[in-house]
Structure formats: C-alpha cells, structure tokens
Amino acid sequence: MAGYGHSTAGGFGSGSGSGPPGPQYMLPQYDEGDDPDADATPAGQGVRLLTNLDNSSYISVSEITSQSSHRDNIRPSRLRQAYEPSIDARTYEPSLDTRTYEPSISDRRHMYEPSIDERSSYMDPPRIPPPDGGSYVSSYMGTESMVSGHGRPWSPESATGYRVPPQGRYEPSEIDGHARPGTPGSSYGNARRPLPSAPAPLHYNSPSRAASHYPRYHGGYADDVTVSMGPDDDRTDIFGPETDLSETRHLNDAYGFRSSQITLSEDPHGTHARSRYDDEDDVSTTYSSNTGTSASGVDKFEHYGPIPEEGKHERRGVRPPQMSRKEVQLINGELVLECKIPTILYSFLPRRDEVEFTHMRYTAVTCDPDDFVARGYKLRQNIGRTARETELFICVTMYNEDEFGFTRTMHAVMKNISHFCSRNKSRTWGADGWQKIVVCVVSDGREIIHPRTLDALAAMGVYQHGIAKNFVNQKAVQAHVYEYTTQVSLDSDLKFKGAEKGIVPCQMIFCLKEKNQKKLNSHRWFFNAFGKALNPNVCILLDVGTRPGGTSLYHLWKAFDTDSNVAGACGEIKAMKGRFGGNLLNPLVASQNFEYKMSNILDKPLESVFGYITVLPGALSAYRYHALQNDETGHGPLSQYFKGETLHGQHADVFTANMYLAEDRILCWELVAKRGERWVLKYVKGCTGETDVPDTVPEFVSQRRRWLNGAFFAAVYSLVHFRQIWKTDHTFMRKALLHVEFLYHLLQLLFTYFSLANFYLAFYFIAGGLADPHVDPFNSDGHVARIIFNILRYVCVLLICTQFILSLGNRPQGAKRMYLASMIIYAVIMVYTTFATIFIVVRQIQPSQKSDDKPDLELGNNVFTNLIVSVASTLGLYFVMSFLYLDPWHMFTSAIQYFVLLPSYICTLQIYAFCNTHDVTWGTKGDNVMRTDLGGAIGKGSTVELEMPSDQLDIDSGYDECLRNLRDRVMVPAVPVSEDQLQQDYYKSVRTYMVVSWMVANATLAMAVSEAYGDSEIGDNFYLRFILWAVAALALFRALGSTTFAAINLVSALVEGRVRLRLNMKGFRWIKEKWGDADVKGKFEGLGDRARGLARR
C-alpha cells in the first residue's frame, strides 16, 4: 500500500480562507509500494493517501480535483471512479486506542506564512498508483454528511494563496530558536553557503528501487543505518551532492517533496507508539467497528474521537526511535559500525567530502585497555583515507559533570585548535593543523554520566542513542568508543558555533566506560589503549570543568618543542571568579583564589628552576608520550603510575595506598628519576586555565582530604627514594639542585606534620601577650584580656578535640553545620590573634605613656625584630612577588579571607585528612555484574544480529530529542546518596595508630613549649622567634626561586629574539661596512620591533 505519511495543513484540501497554515519543515516519507513515476493506476485495491496533520485525518485521491476547479473555489459534490473495491481491498484506518495524539493548531510554534498569490499545494499532486492494478475510489461524503455526521476534522474549502514551503527553503534553527550557522538567515557574518539538497527517501529498503526512481540518491539512503567499511564508502556522499536552492526546489517539485514527514507520538496510555503504515497486512483490510458503519458503505466514514485529556502528549514531529534487528558483519571478530549522522546536523556542515564528517564510528571494545592494540582494534587515524600522524593528543576526563561544565571545557579546546590552525607560518601547524590533533573524552561509568552531557555530545554528532551493546558474542563490553570529526561546537550557553565563528574540524574520540573504575583507569584507557594506537608526540590532560585560555594549549605544546629534555609541563590554574568577580564574595572561593595565585607565583616557578615539580595538576598538564614509556622489562613511569589501580586489601600497606591517592605526584617523580634519562619538568607561565573550585564546606573538605594525604605520602616516598637521582643521566649541577630541593621539601614536610601544634602555640603566645598589664588594651590591668584569652584558649582546645570526633565518625556531607560552625569559631580565634599582633606592634612603636622610655626599634632580640620584622617580611614578599609578576589583585581581594580561614586549613582539613587515611578504595563494589539493558550482538562466525535504529528517521528522532532537552533545560532527578561502603579492618587499625601518634606528637610539643615559655615575654620567647623567622626564611627562599624563574624566562625571550633576528639579518657584515660602526647600532635598534614580532610567533 502506498502512502506519503502525514501532510501538513497545506497538504491536500488546504486553503487560505479557513484553517491554519502548515508547518515549516517537512521531510518526504515513502513506503515500499510508492511509485511516483508510474503513469497508470492499477486496479484491485484501495489506496492510502496523505494525512492531514492538523486533525490526523485521511483524504483519498478522489478528493483531489482539477486545477481549474480549485482556482474557482468550486468544490464538487461527489467524485467517483469507475471501480469500487471490495471490502477486503479497502483501506485500513486504525482504531481509537492505537491512534496517536497530535497537538492542536494553537500548539504549533513554527508557522509558514505564504504569499497571497502562491498556488495551493495540491494543484499539482504527484501520481500515486494504487497497488495491484487497482483504481481510485473517492471517499468524499459530501457537505450534508459532513455536517450531520460525526465531527470530521477541519478541511478547507479553498486553497487559494497557500502552499507548503519547499524543502529547500527550510533553515534549521538552533536549540534557542535562532538560525543555525551557515544558513541564509544566520546572523554570523555573511556566511551564506548553499543548503544541502533534499535528503533521499528515508523509507526505501531496496537499493535497486531507490536507484531506479531516484538516480540522484543512488548509493545514499538506500539501505540500513549501518554501512560497510571500504574505500568506496569514503568517496560516496550519502546525502547526495551539494546543490543550490533553485535545484533543490526543482527536485522537490519533481518528486513530490511537498508532503511532510510521518509524525509519530507516544500512545496517550503509555503503550508503544507505532506508525500507521508500519504493517503492510493491515492496509489491505477494512476496519470500521469504531464507527459502527457497514464495511460496504462508502458514504460512511470513521472519526478519530475526542482528544485525550490525560497522558503524555509528545511534541509534533517527535517520535520514539524504532528499533529493528539487523545482521552486521564483524570486523576481526569485533563489532564496528559506521552510523550516519542526523540529517539536521548534516544540513549545516561546511564539509561533507569525507566519511569522517558524515558517519559516526562505533566500536564495542571487549578487552582490557592494555590489550587494545594487540587485539587488533584500530582508530580512524590508523585506517583508510583518515590515516594520519598525531602530534597532539588531548584527554578530557569526565565523571558526572553536567552539560555546562563539559561544554565550557570542550568549546575552549576547540578554540585552541583553531589557534593552532591560524599559525600559517609554523612548520608544524597551519590550515590543516586540526588533522594532527585528536581529542579523547573518557567518561567514568555509563550509568553515572550526566544525561544532558550525553545530549551535548549527541548534538555535536559524537554520540548516538541506541547503538551501544552490552556484549558481543557473550563477551562483555568494557568500553563503548565513538569516533567522529565534528565541525560544530556548543559554548557554555549551549549555543551552536561553527565555521563562521572560526571553529575548525575536530577529531574526537568518546570513550564511555561500562563500569565506574575511577580516574586512574580512565587514564589507562587514554595512555595504554588509544595512546598506543596513535603514538602521539605530546599528551595533554584536562578535567571537565577546566577552561584553558585561547592560546594555552599552544604554549604548553611549545615547551616540548623548544626543549627536548622536557618530559612534563603544566600551566597556571586559576579559580573561576565568575562574572565581575562575584564568586569572590564567598570566602571559600576567595581563599582558594589566593592559595592558587601564590602557588603559581612562588611554588611552581621555584620547582621549575630545579627541574622537578612535585605535582603536575591533572586539570591542566602535558607529558611527552615517549618519556612515559616503560623499559624492556616493563618497568617505568606508566607501570608505577597505574600500579595504584590494583591495590586492594592487605596486598598493599596504607602508606602505599595513600601515596597513590596523588598518583600524578608519583608520575612526576618517576619521570625525573627515570634510569638513564635526564627528563625535567617545566612550568609554563603563558598557559592558563580556569577551573571551578568548591564553594561549599563539604565539597571543600572532601577534596582536600585526598590532596593532603596524597601529597604527604608522596613527599615521603620521594624523600625516601632520593638516591634514584644518582642513577639518572642528569648533570652534576642538576643533581645538586635537586638535593637542595629535597631539603626544602623535608622542612616543609616537618612543618606540615607539626602544623597543629604550631598554630596553637602561636595563638597561645600572641593572644596571651595582651594579658600583660603593661600591654592591656582594655586598661584593666590585664584582667579583661586574661578572661578573653582563657575563654578562647579553652574553646580552641575543645574545638580541636571535637574535630577529631567529627572526622572519625561523620562525613562532611552529613555534618555540614558542625563543620561550618567549627570554621567560624576558628575564624574568630584568628581575628583576635591578628588584633593582638597589630596592637602589640603599634604599642611597641609608640612611646609608653607611663614612662619616658623611647620605643625600641632597633634590630636585635626584641619584640620589634622577632614579631614585626618577621611577619612584615613574609607579607611584604607576597606583595613584592605579586607585583613582579604583574598580578597583584588577589592581594587586595582575597588575602584577608585566606588569612582568616588559615586555622581551618591547618586544623579542620589536616585533622580530617589524617583521620581518614583508611579511605583508599579505588574500585566500586557490586560493579562487576554484566548488564543487559543495552542488548547484545549475538551470532555465529563473522556475522552477528543486533537491534539498531530502523532508518534515518529514527536517528533524527533521537538527535531532535537531545536538542530539545538542551534547549528546555530538562532537569535530571538527583541520584540518592548510596550507603557508605564498609572499610576493611586493616586500614582502620592502621588509621588509628597513625592518628594517635600524630595527635600525641603535636599535643606533647604544645604542652612542653607552653610550659617552658609560659611566663616569658614575646621578645624572649625562643620558640616563637624560631617559628616566625622560619616562615620568613621559607618565604624568602620561594621568592628567590620565583625571581630566578622570571629572570630565566626573560633571558630566554631575549636570546630567542636575538637568534631570530640573526636569521633575518643576512648580509650584516655588508651593512656594517657600508654604514660604519656608528650606524650599525641604530639599524640594529630599528629592527627590534621586527624581532619582537618574530619572537611572538
């Protein structure tokens, strides 16, 4: 039975005088029996014709009148053909319970407004031959029965001045309603490229039939969603060659493309929706029980009944994708599919000349990542016309971040790739530089990934619903790998950006792991599976949520290009301050902003000078892939890096397990200490990246627990194994500098271990100094100050004890108020201590009112030297170095918040971290069950049978749903927090011993020093002098290292500019001889601007 699907209001029987205009976008839909080019009408069966979308009715061919009758608005009362079919040959109309609901006219958002002089859409209808040689029979009932009978849907009496918009005039819109990039209505510049030709018939299942009737689309949408991989497929444009708008309109008129697509919706009762034309057997029967009319009465007709009032009503044009079983040829025994991209995405792509732009490649990986290459898996960069060398391999790790964090990172990466392609004078990059860059997104767990993030990936063409399978021939799938070269990007506002905004193609690999196996396993997929297949030069690691600067990735890559000894590099991590710095109003965000800034000004430059950076942050770092490789025996940086993934139970001690909580620190150490090599790590100031920092107390405490424990144990590991440095190929000077750095780290480690006692002692001596009657600020002979000090001292001790209880028995998420209250009390103690320090300093400077003694402002063993000079020098170095790096604003916007929360950094975070050293689990219990929710690929030999989307319309339906979800900001229900997993007794017992020893050590130090110097003045307190001057000395050491780093960078820039200048000054001696020595200097300075320009390149 032939049928074109649903028509629009401008379909058969539409008019301009009554009824609404039709929708704007239509796709042609065909069944297997359609034959638009047939000249004769076979007899024997009735014909199902176009459907009126507005009221879901059927109109037979007999209602189509001649052109002259329509122009005169004359409606014939009755039309009949010579042949009336039998009951069995009449068309089938579905019953009420199987029909789909279509929204009313007022619900339509897109209306096509035709001009008054345009012809009706049914003036020149396509010829539709009835099957089996039958002839047409009119089902027109006449005006009387229309009025008196059941309420038949609206049908206009005239079609003057209205017609359906042709397919070629459709301009796809963004998810926010604006014109998409590249369309004539787009506001982006003047980018007007021709729209794609009308898609081929989507419902043809026979390639020969499609080719015979539509030679233009031969080799296109002729068969399944899955196509075989071969050289011929690369040269075939599955959507037809590009054409201009006039040719598109000609084809639409020639092949009757004015009819719209079939609209399928879910059943109001929640049952499975199906097409009215899905079953060919149904169209050869007559069903009229709903109307109660005789099957032989042609004057009767059935109606569709009232609109359902309850149940889910789908939007018009949206249907759930239909799945069908298909037989697929395996490639090397593995499931590899080439899937067509959605039609709408294809419609605004600037390039469609390669299969990487028109097809998404899916691979079901059933092996461990270490065996990816050995099992014969290949990526697109290894096969066919897309075989390329990879210079830069970018890894973006993801857990359950939403679509805003993902698009913020991904859009920034694509803008960086555009910068690579803009460097036309580079020997490595250029217009086709994107072919040397591959972006790999690794998501940790299929059931954990955020649904809207999947929608964002689908909108870019990288992901498609309904393709993945749980198992292939009874082998469990470990990861689902999607490959596509996308040409569009979504910014953080979920708006499409394309070539008109400078976006270049981006080769993407999306690895969706079946199980949640943590970030370390994601990096194993990146390095051992995909990295081994691509063999890149430089690998860049990013976290979802981090937004690198516009040229950050280039500066990061340039560090490896200019120095062959660089094995790893990192950039500057900035806290995301929000619009106009609004996030800095949160003290937590402001304190972290100050911490990040001072670390990037003092710590990272110092360590970069020595050549060993203790940690390259996973949020923005890069490694030379060759330097990461293991030796012939299998030992090396990567083997040690991934060792932490297999640590469970008593097979690993707590020390080793906690050390691998900061696995990136282990990787840094293994690179520098690699036997027989001279690798160094470098900090790149020009590389910046913004990341969202925790803005709530529970998130902040939980994050720092892993950081502090990992950093502490990794530092101990590097100090214990410092002798490995002598087995490397570093120069003697480098080895000496590294030992100096080890000594610096040892002192830092000791201060960290005793930080709790040092904080208490500093508070005890400075705040207790106000209790002296000679210094009392309240003029009460020290009584008021003594009372305040005793209260705060007891509160501080009790709060520290309470902190231990909280850390041992409560999660931060379950005790939010208690953790917040403790941080507030610590802030009050810090404010009072700061007040005491300032008052004592001022009192020391001013002369005493009770005596004629002059203030003691000389350097020596006094309060001025031990308190004022030491504290002022520390803060002064912070200001000086910040101004030296031309980045001082954090000193004015975030310094106060940091120093107020400093006791919480020392007490709350440190206590919670040490009390949770037992929490070293990497895996997820209960996640070793093979799931079957996706189905599987079952078969024998080289072929398997699996369920896939039936045709292109089903792919488009899933894509359209993803765009609607992103546009409407569809909320995802929050996943309830699962119960805490039981920790092993072994870890808890070791945790207890460690916490007790740490607490006893700090308590002993605090009590001993407070008793020894309890009655001494501040100027005579040796321990206080030691603490303050040690802090000042460490700050000075960091400042010297930072200054050295800045000087080295300056010299390097000058040397690089001078070398470039020499390369561009051919014939310098001839110039000297011609102008003389006096003029050479002036000419040399005149070329300075040119040299600086070359250096910037």
Swiss-Prot record:
Extent of Gly residues compositional bias = 8-19
Q: What CDD domains is this protein classified in?
A: Chitin_synth_C
The record's listing under InterPro entries reads: Chitin_synth, Chitin_synth_fun, Chitin_synth_N
Which enzyme class? transferase
Q: Which family does it belong to?
A: Belongs to the chitin synthase family.
PANTHER family hit by this protein:
CHITIN SYNTHASE, CHITIN SYNTHASE 2
Name of the protein in its database record: Chitin synthase 2
Q: Which organism is it from?
A: Neurospora crassa (strain ATCC 24698 / 74-OR23-1A / CBS 708.71 / DSM 1257 / FGSC 987)
Q: Which gene encodes it?
A: chs-2
